[in-house]
Design a protein with these regions (language model features):
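Short, intrinsically disordered or compositionally biased N-terminal tails of bacterial proteins
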Residues: 1-15
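C-terminal interaction segments
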Residues: 182-251
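Basic amphipathic alpha-helical segments that dock to polyanions
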Residues: 65, 69-75
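N-terminal helix-turn-helix DNA-binding core of bacterial DNA-binding proteins
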Residues: 22-60
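Basic, amphipathic "hinge/linker" alpha-helix immediately C-terminal to the N-terminal HTH DNA-binding motif
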Residues: 32, 84-106
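Acidic, aliphatic-rich amphipathic alpha-helical segments
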Residues: 96-174, 221-251
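Low-complexity, glycine/alanine/valine/leucine- and proline-rich hydrophobic stretches
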Residues: 149-207
């Protein structure tokens, strides 16, 4: 017996079963497991290594993340390849997996339009910073390295998350540091975490957050003025909101 094939079959069988041949039911056996849509979100966003995926989904245990990745591979949604150095692997979407893009985008659009999102229970400064790293217009930067220091106020009590971090920006790439990288800081961002999340989601204009003193920028004047234009915001920031009579419109 092929043990590798048997292992893949066992992973598929571990998924929830609806007992129906309907294509929606069968697809949900793969897609609707807890955490799976979020894992797919990260793969679509460009995370390919285990630690990269886990960094943006810190509440999933590492064993459960490993299990979900095995299940997705067994279902033909992703493929994994060993890295040249070490024992870690890279995960990439297959053609089958890439077809989930429309479903993931539709979930994000629905969530942006119809749900109340920013509250103390779902604030996550780490996810916010990783998204800012991904969605910064590097081509708008000056032709040198720019260092932006973020310090967040209003971090919910009892939550373990970043309160200070550094965004390292260059035209060739960007990174987030959770400890002082030792570079001279060009722009300081002192922000209320909820306000910064609302700016990112398109619910609060950056200039209005500054006017309300929820975000304060200091540093090199020319870079401070340019900083808001570097932020591309969430992919879903332009999704139209519901009519005012709907509860989700009361933000």
């Amino acid at each position: 017996m092929n043990l590798s094939r048997a292992g893949r079959a066992a992973n598929v069988c571990a998924m929830a079963r609806f007992g129906q041949f309907c294509p929606i039911a069968v697809a949900c056996e793969v897609f609707a497991e807890r955490w799976t849509p979020i894992i797919l979100r990260e793969l679509f966003a460009g995370s390919h290594r285990f630690n990269e995926i886990h960094r943006c989904i810190p509440l999933i245990s590492r064993p459960l993340l490993a299990r979900r990745l095995r299940e997705l591979e067994a279902a033909g949604v992703i493929r994994s390849t060993p890295q040249q150095k070490g024992k870690s692997r890279e995960y990439h979407l297959t053609e089958s997996g890439r077809e989930f893009r429309a479903a993931v985008d539709a979930l994000g659009t629905w969530g942006q339009r119809w749900t109340l999102r920013v509250n103390p229970e779902n604030l996550d400064s780490g996810l916010l910073m990783w998204n800012i790293r991904r969605r910064t217009a590097l081509e708008r930067l000056p032709p040198r390295r720019v260092v932006v220091e973020f310090e967040f106020r209003g971090v919910p009590a009892g939550r373990s998350m970043l309160k200070k971090c550094w965004l390292i920006l260059e035209r060739t790439g960007s990174d987030v540091c959770v400890s002082d990288p030792g570079f001279e800081v060009d722009v300081y961002v002192d922000a209320d975490l909820a306000a910064m999340a609302n700016v990112w989601l398109g619910d609060l204009p950056f200039a209005e957050a500054v006017r309300q003193k929820k975000i304060k920028l200091t540093g090199v004047p020319a870079l401070v003025r340019a900083f808001p234009d570097w932020l591309l915001l969430s992919h879903f920031a332009r999704v139209p909101r519901p009519p005012a009579e709907f509860p989700a419109a009361q933000r």
